[in-house]
Design a protein with these regions (language model features):
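Residues in the recognition helix of alpha-helical DNA-binding motifs
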Residues: 10, 24, 35, 64
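Short, charged recognition helix plus adjacent turn
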Residues: 13, 52, 62-73
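Base-recognition residues in the alpha-helical recognition helix of bacterial helix-turn-helix
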Residues: 30-34, 45, 63
């Protein structure tokens, strides 16, 4: 599974708009939209930030697992 449907699902589960999430991540709305639609590759540092925000593993965001587990350090 590609990562970008996961981004949308996580955002929608938290009842956030793209604009709200982009503001929380300190990026442009259109930039985040491009990540969420797969038009732009998600940088690793931002993937970490998103995983921390949602408290999920990078494996979940990347689609390597369907098990939502908290991020571990």
């Amino acid at each position: 599974m590609a990562y970008y449907p996961r981004l949308r699902d996580l955002r929608e589960d938290k009842d956030l708009t793209i604009r709200e999430l982009a503001e929380k991540l300190h990026i442009q709305r259109t930039t985040y939209h491009n990540y969420e639609t797969g038009k732009r590759e998600l940088p690793f540092d931002l993937a970490i930030k998103i995983a921390e925000f949602y408290n999920v593993s990078l494996d979940y965001i990347a689609g390597f697992t369907d098990i939502i587990s908290p991020i571990r350090y």
